[in-house]
Amino acid sequence: MAEKYSWMLGDLSVREKDQLEVFRSFEIFPQGNGVAWDLGAGSGIQSIPLEDLGFQVLAIDLSEKLLSEIKARKPDTKIRTKVADIRSRELYQGVSPELLLCMGDTITHLGSEKDWEDTVSLWSSFLSPGSKLILGYRDLSYGKPGDQNIFVVRSEESKIFTCQLQFTQNKAEVTDIFHEKTDKGWTVSSSSYNKLILPLDDLIRTASRNNFKLAKKDEKNGMKFLLFEKL
């Protein structure tokens, strides 16, 4: 389904402008070593605006296909890419960036609350005091166990992307359903996975316990954006 997700996001240049607005509202610009890491970078809708702001960007994702779209969309980019799991201790070595961001709902794709807590701990150990951390995610704590929600994410004459949420105790079971019209009729493909339910207050407390101080927060189209400073 990786090739479907970039289409699902819509006009990526518009998405990049949206992310740039978030960064500017948080007064993000190079101040230290000028290095930014984009965790769960996907096709680069955060990485490209960060480069435009003057950062040297390392885009990290599990999907090599999605990362390859960065160069395809911006042939002259100097963004470096790396296929890696953001939970891996081996990833966090060498000189730490002045800015670490994990957006696009990446943190909710972690396997468990322990994975989330362990990952924040890795960030805290890796980053230097004064470094910035930006998180962007959807707080799914509005759903109660047993609740179900289904909605169309994007549709065109020949393509429909639908998402179904089934809420359990600490997770939401997500099924992405993609309909595409071909010469032979409609085809259907789907992918199911879990998303962590991370209530905003709990997330902030976990960050605080790991020496991250909340500096600013914002919300746009249901996505929460949080800026932390490493103490």
Residue ranges and their predicted role:
Residues E117-P129:
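A short glycine-rich, Lys/Arg-flanked "PGG" loop and its adjoining helix->strand segment in the class I
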Residues M1-Q31, N33-G42:
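Conserved class I S-adenosyl-L-methionine
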Residues E156-K159, D201-K216:
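A SAM-dependent methyltransferase catalytic signature shared across enzymes that methylate proteins
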Residues I134-D201:
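SAM-dependent methyltransferase
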Residues N210-F212, E219-L231:
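Core SAM-dependent methyltransferase catalytic element
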Residues L91-L100:
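A short acidic, Gly/Pro-enriched loop at the edge of an enzyme's catalytic core
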Residues G44-R89:
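Class I SAM-dependent methyltransferase SAM/SAH-binding core
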